[in-house]
């Protein structure tokens, strides 16, 4: 894929700092000045790297200019220009399954029990980083505390290893409060409703404050943004936007600006020389949104098992990471936990996670860490579970469908058995082995309740009616 960075860098020509904002676009400062009573701690420029993981909500690859999209994303584009862009990174098709997979490094068939829920006792990358001596923080969206329908309470941020938290949807799915205007947020577990203000600005302030307060020690910041998830709203920079497309466009631009604010804070604090930043998305773009990518109209695939449902941006930036590189290596969300462990020199996690460390690939020491990705997708009540395995260009579904994928247009073309020859035959055989070697037994039907008239997960058990007649927040 050709380089796409010149327009983005030109848009930032008025600023010399990483992630800086041209004066004509700058908005009022959102952080109060620090008290002058005591000198600020000095930033670390050596030792274990700080690590920041930014997770945009409902954001596929077509949303980034550096990936061929047509949105205004100069700050994320600059991350790609100054770091490594991964062109074959994949999340689960929906937010809760993705977050469970991302945080625990395990396949969903092992520990995904219900939408908006992660069971207490699960070990997350927050625990891993805290065990490594890092100060850990999370700012943004949680959605793991419980679904509000079956009475179970999910894992807390504290139990997941986070020293500090500032979160939307910490509580059960209903009621959850606003993520945008007049936001509801819980600071270290204490909820507060604000009558005014834009939620993403509240989150950004907390993220920047966390960075500044902990600049003298290694920190891990997980920043699962609420942008660009629907509802489509006007942002402080797009107050005249009307209609879903225009408002979504403004939300993408605002998300990018907040990334720029974070990068500017790293530069201002002298932390850009010892901080690794990873930017990605939790699943494909909402299906109401159609975007252009390299001349192709790409409909969002959130919730679908097609490539548009799983294909997300993945950009790594920081010391020791090749600049301006585009990698074809496959990246899966199970890989993040072992990657962070590898980055911080922790012991191998063999047998405890399904992912593999991508650190050698990110650091430019290896070309690939895996040859295929497996997914078990059972997101919520009324969905029949699906299993599929894929590499960069081919996908095999558990029901036998074999497709060729175009990762740019997002089109999947079924390949009949009679046409599975040569390269297609080789990939079919390899993916068939992945499916055969991965979990294929019945799951506990109590974990995935089905409604009357739907097949049970376990054919040997009767269908249940748990959760029927309710909408478990599938758009979250």
Where would I find each of the regions flagged by the language model?
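Positively charged n-region of N-terminal signal peptides that target proteins for export
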Residues: 1-4
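Bacterial N-terminal signal peptides
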Residues: 8-20
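Sec/Tat signal peptide C-region and signal peptidase I cleavage site
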Residues: 21-25
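Formylglycine-dependent sulfatase
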Residues: 27-400, 405-433, 440-476
């Amino acid at each position: 894929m050709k380089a796409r960075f010149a327009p983005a860098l030109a848009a930032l020509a008025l600023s010399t700092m990483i992630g800086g904002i041209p004066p004509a676009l700058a908005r009022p400062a959102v952080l109060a000045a620090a008290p002058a009573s005591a000198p600020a701690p000095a930033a670390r420029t050596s030792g274990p790297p700080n690590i920041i993981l930014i997770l945009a909500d409902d954001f596929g690859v077509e949303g980034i200019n550096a990936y061929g999209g047509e949105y205004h994303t100069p700050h994320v584009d600059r991350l790609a220009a100054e770091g490594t862009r991964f062109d074959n990174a994949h999340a689960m098709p929906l937010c809760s399954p993705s977050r469970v997979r991302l945080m625990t490094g395990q396949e969903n068939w092992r520990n995904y029990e219900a939408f908006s829920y992660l069971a207490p006792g699960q070990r997350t990358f927050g625990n891993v980083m805290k065990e490594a001596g890092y100060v850990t923080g999370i700012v943004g969206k949680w959605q793991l505390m419980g679904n509000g329908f079956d009475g179970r309470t999910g894992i807390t941020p504290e139990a997941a290893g986070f020293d500090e938290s500032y979160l939307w949807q910490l509580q059960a799915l209903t009621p959850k409060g606003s993520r945008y205007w007049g936001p509801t947020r819980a600071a270290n577990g204490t909820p507060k409703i604000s009558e005014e203000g834009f939620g993403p600005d509240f989150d950004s302030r907390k993220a920047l404050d966390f960075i500044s307060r902990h600049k003298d020690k290694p920190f891990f910041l997980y920043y699962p943004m609420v942008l660009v998830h629907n509802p489509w709203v006007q942002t402080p920079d797009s107050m005249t936007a009307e209609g879903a497309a225009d408002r979504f466009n403004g939300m993408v631009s605002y998300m990018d600006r907040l990334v720029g604010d974070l990068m500017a804070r790293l530069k201002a604090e002298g932390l850009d020389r010892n901080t690794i930043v990873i930017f990605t998305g939790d699943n494909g773009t909402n299906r109401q949104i159609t975007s252009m990518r390299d001349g192709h109209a790409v409909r969002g695939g959130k919730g679908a098992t097609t490539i548009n449902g799983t294909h997300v941006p993945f950009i790594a930036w920081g010391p020791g990471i090749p600049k301006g590189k585009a990698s074809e290596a496959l990246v899966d969300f199970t890989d993040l936990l072992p990657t962070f462990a590898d980055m911080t020199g922790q012991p191998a996690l063999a047998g405890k996670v399904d992912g593999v460390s991508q650190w050698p690939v990110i650091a430019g020491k290896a070309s690939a860490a895996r040859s295929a990705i497996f997914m078990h997708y059972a997101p919520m009540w009324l969905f029949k579970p699906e299993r599929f395995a894929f590499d960069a260009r081919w996908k095999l579904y558990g029901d036998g469908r074999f497709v060729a994928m175009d990762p740019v247009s997002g089109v999947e073309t079924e390949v009949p058995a009679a046409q599975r020859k040569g390269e297609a035959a080789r990939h079919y055989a390899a993916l068939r082995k992945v499916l055969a070697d991965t979990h294929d037994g019945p799951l506990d039907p109590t974990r995935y309740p089905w409604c009357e008239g739907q097949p049970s997960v376990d054919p040997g058990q009767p269908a249940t009616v748990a959760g029927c007649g309710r909408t478990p927040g599938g758009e979250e």
